[in-house]
Each structure stands twice: as structure tokens, then as C-alpha cells.
Amino acid sequence: MPTLVGSQASELDENNALRKGASDGEVSMGIKYSLSSDRVAEIAINPDFSQVEADEEQIDVNTTFALNYQEKRPFFNEGADLTDTPVDVVYTRSINNPTGVGRIISRGQKDSWVLLSALDDDSPYIVPGEEQSFTSMGGKSFSNIFRYKRSLKEGSFLGLIATDRRMVNNNGSGSVVGFDTRYRFNDTYQVEFQSVFSRTQEPNDSLVVSSATFGDNHTFTFDGESFSGNALELEFQRNTEHWRVETGYDHRTPTFRAENGFVTNSNHRRIYGQSLWIYFPNNFFSQVLGGVHASVGHNFDGVQKAKYIVLFSNLAMPRQTRLNVMYARRMQYRFKDTELNGTYDLKINLNSQFSERYQFGTNIGRHVAPVRFLEVPEEGRLTTTSFWTRMQASDRLNVGLSYNSQKMTTMDRKTDYFSGYTTTLRASYQHNKSLGFKVLIQYNDFSKDFQIQPLLTYQPSPFTIFYIGSTQNQNVNTLSYDAINAGQLTNRQYYLKFQYLFK
């Protein structure tokens, strides 16, 4: 199907004034063809994802690892169930701005597979380390992802997975190949296993510069090094109606990377166990669940990095209401060569679908946690609060609101390390079957960024689409009407799309 896409962006110039960019237009093309009843091929040239809703703000002040953002592009969500494995070697957000992408999905009674190829203009790097990850935006790349899965008896399966990304403008590359399986001995016992091997060739440029080293004195700086790595997951499960037990082992070698995946940390080995009890009282509580989880982690030098135990419970009540309570105690935690052995997490979470039209949830957390951004980390008191709600105000109007806040202080509560919040409002109005309007409004108190993204859509048929929208970001001091009016516009983009199926 041919599509006409247009856009115009404005950004701040060197004088801190908003400068309009040139208008841009291009033709996009998408072809979807059924090769057979269980096999579909799809190709997209200059695919347009500008109508996809912006990512929801996340709080990363005390986080040293890259954040995971949900894949919202419909093209990449199709077939995602096949590429989901214990080791996250496929993360389609690594294909950031494709100029061309093709895919074949085959789903048979026993054999299923997917092949995805993409040429990407702006490919991100996520470089895993022991205590942090490094991120950078690279250039053009060509990616291939293949996944094969064969179903066996009673839910067992065998699987193969392979990914390969080659940078176009330098010699950087990253490949992964692996095997995974789930084998069910009977209705009670099963084992899951995955092992993947990586081969990485770094580019020789300044995209990532760091004095830190890993493995056999490799540097995180992109200086043309090449190395291989391995990741492994092994888990044994015993499942009955009232008792479930899991025990397992996993590791990531210091040199393991997955350029098409989401692997943020390496150089760790972990042994864990979990026991879960389930009771069905058939009264006000339809299900009562309680459990314990314990884990010990080391790096590949034999240094113990963490030892903790988690107690958790879940109560199921009427109107799809669930109460979750979790307490985690870290008996030992080592970060930046500093021992922090008094940290813990306490979380209480309540979610409910109170009625067909109204859902809500809230989460409260009290923590003694490492202050990771300090040169010498210390323990601090962290308070987290969040809530969300979704409401169908009418047959045509849906509204959603979320709020997340974090505050960290010294142990004596006299000094704040940081304090702030993010909030998001979503609303959609469907005037009729063809005409609709959506708006996303969000504010990040940490970055002082206010964003609004309205979108008007008109779709009289499945293959005829017209939409027009914009994305606008402002720097504001606080979330108020006056502050928004006085806030400085930092960037703005307008876009439109017209798609029509010619017969």
C-alpha cells in the first residue's frame, strides 16, 4: 500500500531560539502477502511510525543501566511471541529508524519460524558492563534476526535463535547464535534451558569512550577490539496445584553482548531458588499466595556481589482486585568496591478493575537503597509512590492518568539526594467509526520537560488512512498553567500521513 508522509521539525539553535527546519516528504510503501495459509511475508519501504505514541517517561536518577522501553510499533509486535526467550537477544527497539524492513512469519502445527531483515539509519548501542551499561547512537546498520521453534509433546519445545548486525559505515558488527528448550517430564516437573554465544567486532571510533576495562583487559572504548562471550539460563520447576518450586542458575560472561538485544549487564553468575504456596479459600479471598525467593550472585573473578532473600504474598479479591506485598532484604551488596549490607525494599501494590469502566492501581515503596551516582556509594532512604487509573468516561471517551514519584534522602533524612515525579495523561475520543482524536500529555519534574502530542485520525476503510499530528516539548519550572505558558519551547514537530489502496 502506498503512503505519503510529510513532516516539519523545529529545534533550538545556538542562540537558544527555535529555528524551523525544512519540510520533508517521502513516499512509504508496504506490501503484505500470504505465501500459504500459515506463512505471511511483509515488506515496508520507508515505514512510517510517527503516529506511534511517545514513550512514557521513566525515572532514571539512581539507575546505572539502560532503560527498557516498550515496543509500540505494530510491524515489530507481530511475531514478538516467537522471539521472546529467557536471554533477551532480540529487542526490536534496536532497529530504531528503518528505511527498509522485511519479514516472513511461518506458524505450523509443530514448526514455527520468523525471519526479519532491516536496514536502519540510526542504530543504538547498548554496551553491558558489570555495574553499568554504556549507550550511544551509532549510524547505519543492516540487521538479520532468525528464530525457529519446534513444538513437542505436552508443551515441550526446541528452539534456535540467531541475530546479526553489521554497521554500514564502519567495520563494527555483532552476532549471536543460541539454542533453547523446555522439556516437560510430566504434569509436575519441567526444565528450561538456553545458551547463546556472541561474537563482537567493535568499530574504531569515539561513540563510546571509557577508561574502564572488562574481561582480559578489554576496554569499553570502541577501539576495534573483537571478542566472544556466552550467556546461559537454566531453571528446574516443580508445579502442583498448591506448591511450586523453582531453582536455577544463570550467567553472562564479561565479554557477552547482544547488539540486537537488550542485555544491560555482564560479568555475573547467579544461583537462585524460589518456593511458592497457593491456597484457594473460596470466600472473600479467591486465592492466597505466599512465597520466598533467595539468590546469591558473583562476578567471574569470584567476588560475591549480592546475597538477598525476598518474601512476597498476593491476595485475590472480588472485582479483579489484587493486593501484593513484597519485602526484600539484601544481606550483602557490593557496588563500586563498597560493601552496603543494610539495604532492603518494602513494596505494597494494589490493583483493581472496580467496574467495567474503571480500573486503578497504586504502589507504595519504602527502601534503604544504594545511592549509586555518588563516587563512593552510600545507603540512603528512598520513598516511591505511584498510581494509575483508566476510565471509560463514555462509549466514545477513554481517559488514563499515571503518576510516579521518588525521593531519596540521607539516612538521617536531613539532606535530599533527589526528589521529583513524572505524570502522564492519555485521552482518546472516537467520534464515529472513522474519525478519532488522541492526545498524550506528560511532564518530567526531573528534566523539567513538558510534552504534548495530539493526533487526529480519519480512517473510512481499513486501507484508507489520513492523520495529522504534532509533538511539542517545552522546558517548564513546574507543572502549572502559568509555568507552561511561560515555558520555553525546545522542539516541535508536525506530521501528516495519507494512505490509500488503489484498486
Regions found by a protein language model. Name each.
Residues 1-150, 159-160, 171:
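Structural preference for beta-rich elements and adjacent junctions enriched in aromatics
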Residues 4-23, 126-142, 147-149, 161, ...:
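Primarily recognizes Gram-negative and organellar outer-membrane beta-barrels
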Residues 35-37, 141-164, 169-197:
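Transmembrane beta-barrel wall of Gram-negative outer-membrane proteins
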Residues 97-99, 174, 185, 191-503:
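Exposed, low-structure sequence patches enriched in small/polar residues
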Residues 28, 32, 37-42, 101-103, ...:
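Beta-sheet entry/capping signal
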Residues 5-7, 34-38, 44-50, 109, ...:
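An acidic- and aromatic-residue-enriched active-site/binding cleft used to recognize and process polar
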